[in-house]
C-alpha cells in the first residue's frame, strides 16, 4: 500500500495523475486529503488517517509519499507511523515560505520542535528524497543540504516544484518500498 499526500494545492488535477502513476508500483494507493491551513489539526488528522490506512491495508511494506507540503508531512507522519517515506521537493520550512497562505504558519515551528529530538537520525535511510533542480518554489540545494546527511537524494533534471511526472523514478521507489 502507498499513502499519497498532496501538496498545498489540494485540488490540482495533478494529484490524480500522481496516484495513477504510483499504482504502477502498488495498485493500493490511498489519497489522504488534509486542510493545508491548520497545521496542528492536519497533523492529528494525518496521524489518525495514515494509521487507519496501515491497519486496513495489511501491507508490511507500506509507503507514504508526498509532494511539497505533502513531503513535509510524509517524512514526519511516516516516521511516527513506522513506514518508509518518499518526499518529492519537500517543503521543510513552510513557516517561512507560506505566510499569507496558511492561518498559523508558526504552528509548523511548534510541530518541528515537538517532534522527537533528532528524529532524522532515528529515521536515517528510511526516507527517499527526490529533488528538482528546477524547483521554482523552493531552494532545492538548501533542502539537499539539510537532508543529505540522513537520506538518499535523487536529483531530477526536468520536473518543476509540483513534480507532474513521477515515471522516471517509479522503479527506484518500488525498490525502496520493497526494503520495508
From Swiss-Prot:
SUPFAM superfamilies in the cross-refs: alpha/beta-Hydrolases
Please identify the protein, giving its name as recorded: UPF0227 protein YE1706
Q: Which family does it belong to?
A: Belongs to the UPF0227 family.
User: Record's Pfam families?
Assistant: UPF0227
